[in-house]
UniProtKB/Swiss-Prot annotation:
HAMAP family: Ribosomal_uS10. Keywords: Ribonucleoprotein, Ribosomal protein. GO terms for molecular function: structural constituent of ribosome; tRNA binding. The lineage of its organism: Bacteria, Pseudomonadati, Pseudomonadota, Alphaproteobacteria, Hyphomicrobiales. One of its GO terms (biological process) is translation. The keyword Mitochondrion does not apply. Belongs to the universal ribosomal protein uS10 family. It comes from Rhizobium leguminosarum bv. trifolii (strain WSM2304). One of its GO terms (cellular component) is ribosome. Part of the 30S ribosomal subunit. The gene is rpsJ. NCBIfam families: PRK00596.1, rpsJ_bact. This is Small ribosomal subunit protein uS10.
């Protein structure tokens, strides 16, 4: 795959699972002879939800919940066919969303 890069975007709610998956992808790519740029930590998306504590009265009493989405970006430069095969066979954690662009 001459002159082509693979861009991988990873998303997860837990940053520890995300970092472990990133390390696994980087080690697999380096083992097959490709060079890796990254991982680049992208901004964390924080969604906040505010709900009433009581179902009936007390509008002033509220509770806030938040959901954090952590993201990482990897570029694999000049991947070999072995790199692509190894990445396809890679089994990542269940809570990680992977987007791949060629």
């Amino acid at each position: 795959m001459n002159g082509q890069n693979i861009r991988i975007r990873l998303k997860a709610f837990d940053h520890r699972i995300l970092d472990a998956s990133t390390r696994e992808i980087v080690s697999t790519a380096k083992r097959t002879g490709a060079s890796v740029r990254g991982p680049v930590p992208l901004p964390t998306r924080i969604e906040k939800f505010t709900v009433n504590r009581s179902p009936h009265i007390d509008k002033k009493s509220r509770e806030q919940f938040e959901m954090r989405t952590h993201k990482r970006l990897l570029d694999i430069v000049d991947p070999t066919p072995q790199t692509v095969d190894a990445l396809m066979k890679l089994d990542l954690a269940a809570g990680v969303d992977v987007e791949i662009k060629l």
